[in-house]
């Protein structure tokens, strides 16, 4: 469906939301936009914060794919860190650490895989 390469920079999070919205609406999949925007921005934010290396040329990949059954889409974010994503337990006073909880709440399923040169974190949205 769509594949993008983003700089490992916090300014890319807002761009991510705009691109996800535009891509899904263009393809008539606007009903996925609210959840897909949030999931993509959370996964890109995690990649920027936790996979940041000393190499400013490091890139983050974002892919949106429609499922073979055409009833679901996948949001996939790749980064250069081989470390697994960690879902933190938070309290109402916590100011950070809710990203993967949000992804879990908004998706039908999420997970991650090792990729050459890093990992891919994905979330599947079904309507």
Q: Each PLM stretch: what is its role?
A:
Residues 31-55:
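Conserved ATP-binding N-box helix of the HATPase_c
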Residues 1-3, 48-127:
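Conserved beta-strand-loop-beta-strand hairpin that lines the nucleotide-binding pocket
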Residues 1-38:
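Bergerat-fold GHKL ATPase/HATPase_c domain
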